[in-house]
Amino acid sequence: MFVQILGSAAGGGFPQWNCNCVNCAGFRDGSLNAQARTQSSIAISDDGVNWVLCNASPDIRAQLQSFAPMQPGRALRDTGISAIILMDSQIDHTTGLLSLREGCPHQVWCTDMVHEDLSTGFPLFTMLKHWNGGLDWNRIELDQSFTVAACPSLRFTPLPLRSAAPPYSPHRFDPHPGDNIGLIVEDLGTGGKLFYAPGLGKVDAPLLEIMAGSDCVLVDGTMWDDDEMQRRGVGTRTGREMGHLAQNGPGGMLEVLEQLPEQRKVLIHINNTNPILDEDSPERAELVRRNVEVAYDGMSIVL
């Protein structure tokens, strides 16, 4: 299984266009040792030719341009994208579908809840019908694994996760299973197994057991502290209120990952305020000490 990190930042990317927090300002003036990052998206393949796109970020055009296999050049119009899986209906995970309209129809897998959001509050399915029929919806059943024809060796198993639906969702304040999912992706040929959850608000014992059965966990790294945005003066909401489990503190993501000594552990969906973006920070050093990696744009994982 080939896993390509197309984008590793949370919504807004890094540096965020309108932000002058310590991280963003420091990156711009050259005082911060950090890498720029686009908004979270990954691609997965069983052969390195046909790819399943997991989330379509607003930065999708630049992300595809930076990864040569996404343009195999087999025809006058071509793409390496064979299917698209949406983990949720958030703007930073779905807006890229608009930029992919020239390639419609696209095969899109998502849950009933995500399809409802993207047919009402943010009606991408309706809008894109005008381009060669738009998006062909393939329903993700929460209790069933599924395969994608172009990558037959990969088995995808959805996992309903505790998180929050976006502000435009009809059930913003009435959470439903399927608002947000994680994925277990298993390569039936190599036996490699990936746990992928860029939006993760809580890890209970059953979920931890599933994570322990994976070779690599690629998980929510949005915030270091739950009140990080408040501390940085750029927001009023906590990580938990937005459906993200912070790394630091009792019950935080680092405590969770500490229970997975055998797995490769990688944080993704990093918010622009997170001090781990600073490669010289004590927080980054703590991750190194704990053998936890920070995803970056262009990172490749083979399982």
UniProtKB/Swiss-Prot annotation:
It comes from the Bacteria. Keywords: PQQ biosynthesis, Transport. GO terms for biological process: pyrroloquinoline quinone biosynthetic process. InterPro entries: Metallo-B-lactamas, PQQ_synth_PqqB, RibonucZ/Hydroxyglut_hydro. CDD domains: PQQB-like_MBL-fold (cd16274). Disulfide bonds: none annotated. The keyword Transport applies. This is Coenzyme PQQ synthesis protein B.
